[in-house]
Every structure is written in structure tokens, then in C-alpha cells.
From Swiss-Prot:
One Pfam family, short name: Fer4_7
Residue stretches making up the 4Fe-4S ferredoxin-type domain: 328-357, 368-396
Protein name in UniProt: Ion-translocating oxidoreductase complex subunit C
Compartments where located: Cell inner membrane
Length: 473
């Protein structure tokens, strides 16, 4: 796909600790880091060579974000790359650092730093699960990647196993991807390390907790992650990016994105640069804005609607779903819950959506937490079967944010209390030291006075004795 006239790179800055490495009117090369990396932030890299046109703080497109605008020079020049031929000659710590500095994050939607995930799995995980199961219907980006780049993905798996000392790799793939399955079987040579696991096509089979249950029969406990029970899960796109970061020395600047519509007028996979405006992406594929009703980042179930087409492709954007304009408005208003219980039957993580809905309506945050609203994977299966058209996931997301804010506020109060107690203890210790020093000073002064009196008495006694001796003579 040709380069757009502008790239929009959004950098999340929830903690206000992002430090920029570039400034306006500065020339950059493709792969050049735009921010300094730390424990909380992986770097974002320039998707092409060009000029930093503008830097906007707290932009309107996404709240709490920094927006960097790059005008390409169409030369597409890379920075100096440092490929590694034999990764086994390097220490695991060095490889993890390269993955971190290459900006690799979870490309299945989580966007959690892959370097941290690998660090957490060392001495804890015994199995690597390669997630090639599409999270939603119609999305084919993972299948496209695994079909065309399976050899590179297998190398990426070996790199992760070298770092974490994992001895088993399970490649999870859907049963309808027959060509990809046969290609994997043909290329796998180490049968003791790699095992292919064919998953039935059932939504949402690609969710990490559902996938672990399907493959192993084990359930991830509430409030825990798959690593806690010994399974490290990576999306195929993430593993592919890890391979490119180590072997090719290339940071993450592009990804495969599925473009699809509700009427199946268009469906395809494209290599898209991070930061490409969605409006340009659609127009370059001959989609007229006048025929588009809405655009979703993601699939038809879990996709999030966007109103501003100047929004850009993010690292976690695996697909764009388009709905076309219809002659009639088919929007249906929310009705009262009839307690049918259908939502509970279809929930893949065994929650009680109906009960959570009533607790949320009554603002009973204690009960929503006890009933594991934080474990909701936001698959919207409950919404699809609800006869009252209640947007349950919308309520669950709002409740998650409320619980998150409550937790942050409680932690802030705890830290304030700890700081207050520490300060009080310090002041008490200082006062005690002052009193002890004063008492010591007074004791020394008193002892000195007593010594002076004693010396005077002894001197007088001695003089009296001398005078008595003289009088006797």
C-alpha cells in the first residue's frame, strides 16, 4: 500500500511519565524511537523516514495521549539495523532488552509489553501456547500471517523457548484453516517440541482463558492469568514481531490488518504501517465515505466504534470492520430485563451477566467485584442473545472502570496513611533524640557541678588538716 501524506502516532500517557526523544521539525528515519523506554512504556518507532510536523499533548482524538504527526519524505530509509544470526550466543537478558527496545507488545489486542510477559514467565511457565485462533468471525489476519510466514513464526517460538527454558509448544489453530495446518505439519521437524492442537470454530475460542480450558481442561482462577498455572500465551503476530526484532533487528513499525464489511463487499489482509490514518486506508481501498455507516476497530462482536476517521492504525489493531448505510434505521431501544437467563448460558467464562446487571444498576460495587465482573472478557455473547437488547458489556466496562478507580483511590489512601505514619514516627524519633541529648547534656552538667563541689570540699578538708598539723607543732 502506498504511503499516506501524514502519519498519526498516538502514545498512551496515563501516568504522565513519557519522555519524547524528538521535537518538531526534526528529521527521523524508519525505526527510529520517538520516546524513551522505561519499565512502564515500550518505545514507539517512526513508521517511515520524514519530518516531525507536529506534537500535540492531550489531543482530542484519544484522551490522555500524545499525538505525533510525521510527514514522510517517501524515501523510506531505515535506521542502522543490528540483526542477530545466532541468538543462542546471547544471554536471555540481552534478548529481552532487544524485544523491549523494539517496541513489541501483544498484537492480539492486549498490547501488554511482551518483554514483561516473558520476564514473568521465567521459572513459572512450562508450556508456550501459540494463539493462531482468530478472536472473532471474519478476521483472517492471523491465518494469513501463519500461512505466509510460518517458518519465521517457528523461529520466534524457538527464541522464546530459549529465553524461558520452555520445553513444550502448543500451536492452537482453528479446524477450518486446512491449508495452514498442512503447511505447519510439513515444516515442523522437532516433533518433541511442537504440537499442533486443532480447535473447533466456536466464538470466542481465541480468548486466552477459553483457549487454556479448550487445550488443557484447566481453568484459569479468578483474578489470575494463564502464566500463574504455567502457560505462556502469545499471538502469532507477536511471535512474528519477536523474530523480526531479534533475527532481522527490525522494530515494530507495521502489522497485518484485516479489512471487512458487513455485506461481504470487501474482505482482505494488508500490511499496514503503524500510524496510518484510517480514512486513508479506506480510500486507498476504494471505499467511499458516503456509503459507510460506521467504522469499528476490531471485529463485529468486540470492535469499538470510532467517529473520527483521522484515528490511526495502532499496534493492537488487527482488523477494521465497516457497516454500510441502510435505508431504514434499525436501532432498537433498550428494554427492561425479563430475567430469562439466556446470558448466563452463553457466557464463556461462566459469569452471571443478569445478576451483575442488577448489582450495577443498584451501584453495589462490592457485589459486582465478588461476582467477578473483572473477569468479563467483553465478548458480547450475552448482548447478542438478550431479548431486551440490553448493552450488558457497556455496563460491565463502566463498572470495571469504577472498580479500577476505587482500587486506585484506596491504594492512594493507603500510601497517604503510610506516609503519614512514617512522618509521625520520624518526628517522634527526632523529638526523642532531642530529649535524650538534652538529658545527657544536663546530666553531664550536673556531674561536672558535683565534681567541682567535691573538689572544693576535698581541697578545704585538706587545708583544714594542714592547719591542724601546723597548730600542733
Amino acid at each position: 500500500m502506498p504511503l499516506p501524506d501524514k502519519f498519526f502516532l498516538f502514545i498512551q500517557d496515563d501516568y504522565h511519565n513519557v519522555k519524547l526523544r524528538v521535537k518538531i521539525n526534526e528529521k527521523v528515519l524508519r525505526g527510529q524511537p520517538l520516546i524513551f523506554s522505561d519499565d512502564f512504556n515500550v518505545p514507539v518507532h517512526a513508521p517511515t523516514s520524514g519530518l516531525i510536523e507536529n506534537i500535540c499533548f492531550n489531543s482530542d482524538s484519544i484522551k490522555k495521549n500524545i499525538k505525533i504527526v510525521i510527514s514522510p519524505d517517501y524515501l523510506d530509509q531505515w535506521i542502522r539495523l543490528n540483526p542477530i544470526k545466532d541468538y543462542k550466543k546471547y544471554a536471555p537478558e540481552k534478548l529481552i532488552k532487544i524485544i523491549h527496545q523494539s517496541g513489541v507488545v501483544g498484537l492480539g489486542g492486549g498490547q501488554f509489553p511482551s518483554s514483561k510477559k516473558i520476564i514473568f514467565s521465567i521459572n513459572r511457565a512450562h508450556t508456550l501456547i501459540v494463539n493462531a485462533v482468530e478472536s472473532e468471525p471474519y478476521i483472517t489476519s492471523d491465518n494469513c500471517l501463519i500461512y505466509n510466514h510460518i517458518s519465521e513464526i517457528l523461529i520466534g517460538c524457538k527464541i522464546i523457548c530459549w529465553i524461558t527454558k520452555i520445553k513444550t509448544v502448543l500451536i492452537a489453530i482453528q479446524e477450518d484453516n486446512i491449508q495452514s495446518i498442512s503447511k505447519i505439519q510439513h515444516l515442523i521437524k522437532n516433533k518433541s517440541l511442537f504440537k499442533i492442537c486443532i480447535i473447533k470454530k466456536k466464538y470466542p475460542a481465541g480468548s486466552s482463558k477459553v483457549l487454556v480450558k479448550s487445550l488443557t481442561g484447566k481453568e484459569v482462577p479468578h483474578g489470575k492469568h494463564s502464566i500463574d498455572i504455567g502457560y505462556l500465551i502469545f499471538n502469532v503476530a507477536t511471535i512474528f514481531s519477536i523474530k523480526r526484532a531479534i533475527i532481522n533487528g527490525k522494530p515494530l513499525t507495521e502489522r497485518v490488518v484485516t479489512l471487512m464489511s458487513d455485506k461481504n463487499l470487501l474482505s482482505g489482509n494488508f500490511w499496514v504501517r503503524i500510524g496510518t490514518p484510517i480514512k486513508y486506508f479506506l480510500t486507498s481501498n476504494k471505499l467511499k465515505q458516503s456509503f459507510i455507516a460506521s467504522v469499528y476497530l476490531g471485529g463485529p462482536f468486540m470492535g469499538k466504534k470510532i467517529n473520527n476517521l483521522n484515528h490511526s492504525i495502532l499496534k493492537k489493531t488487527n482488523s477494521i470492520f465497516i457497516t454500510h448505510k441502510k435505508e431504514k434505521n434499525e436501532s432498537i431501544s433498550e428494554k427492561t430485563c425479563i430475567r430469562c437467563g439466556y446470558c448466563s448460558y452463553v457466557c464463556p467464562v461462566n459469569l452471571l451477566p443478569q445478576q451483575l446487571y442488577w448489582y450495577i444498576k443498584n451501584k453495589n460495587h462490592v457485589q459486582t467485584k465478588k461476582h467477578y465482573v473483572l473477569d468479563c472478557i467483553e465478548c458480547k455473547a450475552c448482548e447478542k442473545v438478550c431479548p431486551s437488547y440490553i448493552p450488558l458489556v457497556k455496563y460491565f466496562i463502566q463498572e470495571k472502570n469504577i472498580l479500577k478507580n476505587i482500587t486506585l483511590e484506596n491504594n492512594r489512601k493507603k500510601m497517604s496513611l503510610i506516609r503519614f505514619k512514617t512522618r509521625e514516627q520520624r518526628l517522634f524519633n527526632e523529638k526523642r533524640m532531642i530529649h535524650e541529648n538534652n538529658d545527657t547534656f544536663l546530666m553531664k552538667k550536673k556531674d561536672k557541678k558535683i565534681n567541682n563541689i567535691t573538689k572544693t570540699v576535698l581541697k578545704k578538708t585538706l587545708q583544714d588538716a594542714i592547719e591542724r598539723m601546723k597548730s600542733k607543732q
